[in-house]
């Protein structure tokens, strides 16, 4: 799986790259990310909106628990933006190496939740354009309107309403902090 040629990599969709990075990494993972103050602040803001969704019967859990077990799924892309220090960014073959390096061990971490199918939604990174350009979509903000838009993006998957955990990564590119997140659930419970 690690031997993907440049042309094949550049034709992958964002979802395919995530799936490939989950399946293709046998190496050890990076050290676990310790939540920053920004991550804790953001999850508090997200949970205010999430609770409203719960009361309205739109999600299964009253709040999301900050759990960085799935952070590699988004950090691998955040690191691409940080290393090239630009957004938007046209994906290159060297970006694939960053994605693989940063997502190593993700599949193993997700096994206890039922595997990669436990991932339920993501927000903060665009799907690649036809020219393979991706962008960080959401500048960091705990302001109510921005958080509501972000939560709506997280809920843009058929399994999103089942989410009980959230992993957050806040990449910094050209001095601006962005927010990215992935939600997931425990399929084994």
Regions of interest found by a model, annotated:
Residues 96-189:
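A well-ordered secondary-structure block
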Residues 32-109:
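Short, well-ordered surface patches within globular domains
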Residues 16, 77-81, 154-157:
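Alpha-helix boundary/capping residues
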Residues 3-5, 27-36:
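Short, polar/proline-rich extracytoplasmic segments that appear immediately after membrane translocation
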Residues 23-24:
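C-terminal motif of bacterial Sec signal peptides marking the signal peptidase cleavage site
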Residues 1-20:
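N-terminal secretory signal peptides and thylakoid transit peptides that target proteins
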